[in-house]
């Protein structure tokens, strides 16, 4: 699974994994938003590979648990993106910490995840 798959880093990771014929669960904030999914759906998939786009809210622990369920590896690139804020702690730092904690808690609650890669 790649969190933040619609972002710059996440989408490049997804493209690389698909080019190697891997199955990828790609999480996005809004699966109905063409800006978030069209570029992912247009990626080349090598033989044996598969792309599954899943909507996930980092701040909703149940959403994160559903997305992690059944995955062997998690590459966590998702983050709350706010370009400018006078309340950076509240709008950027706290949500990023909670989101990462939700990912880690979801991984801890399952026996299937064997590998975690976290970017920051």
Where is each model-derived feature located?
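A short helix-coil junction within the Rossmann-fold of NAD(P)-dependent oxidoreductases
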Residues: 84-85, 106-113
């Amino acid at each position: 699974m790649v969190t933040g798959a619609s972002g710059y880093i996440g989408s490049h990771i997804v493209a690389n994994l698909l080019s190697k014929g891997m199955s990828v669960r790609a999480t996005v904030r809004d699966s109905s938003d063409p800006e978030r999914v069209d570029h992912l759906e247009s990626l080349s998939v090598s033989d044996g590979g598969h792309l599954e786009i899943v909507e996930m809210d980092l701040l909703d622990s149940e959403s994160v648990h559903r997305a992690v369920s059944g995955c062997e590896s998690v590459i966590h690139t998702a983050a709350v993106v706010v370009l400018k804020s006078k309340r950076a702690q509240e709008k950027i730092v706290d949500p990023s910490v909670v989101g990462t904690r939700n990912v880690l808690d979801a991984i801890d609650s399952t026996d299937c995840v064997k590998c975690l890669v976290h970017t920051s």
